[in-house]
Amino acid sequence: MAKLEFNVDMERDNKLLFRKEINYTIKFENDKTPSREDIRKLLANNYGSDESLIIVDKNRQETGKHEIKGYAKIYDTKEHAMLYEPDYELFRNKLKVKEGNQ
């Protein structure tokens, strides 16, 4: 993983849905764009959380810029993530595996 510079743009506790919501900016060197997995690891390290509790919802990158603006959610428990997140988000973030994929 390349050197990543992580900044929190906005953070709020959503007590109703048992999660923390984070808008962030990640700047990276002249290398490939960080994957969702890389971003989940970065968030887990910064927030002292388990990767299985983190949902990387959106990432937006402008062409030619080495910067990502994104939105992620950190749940209190995996059960809350499974309850409130749609299946496609759980599959994207590897919290749920499609049947038949080995």
UniProtKB/Swiss-Prot annotation:
Organism this protein belongs to: Picrophilus torridus (strain ATCC 700027 / DSM 9790 / JCM 10055 / NBRC 100828 / KAW 2/3)
Family assignment from sequence similarity: Belongs to the eukaryotic ribosomal protein eS24 family.
Disulfide bonds: none
Source species taxonomy: Archaea, Methanobacteriati, Thermoplasmatota, Thermoplasmata, Thermoplasmatales
GO terms, molecular function: structural constituent of ribosome
Keywords assigned: Ribonucleoprotein, Ribosomal protein
Gene Ontology biological process: translation
Keyword Lipid metabolism: no
Transmembrane recorded as keyword: no
Pfam family, one: Ribosomal_S24e
Record's GO cellular component terms: ribonucleoprotein complex; ribosome
The protein, known as: Small ribosomal subunit protein eS24
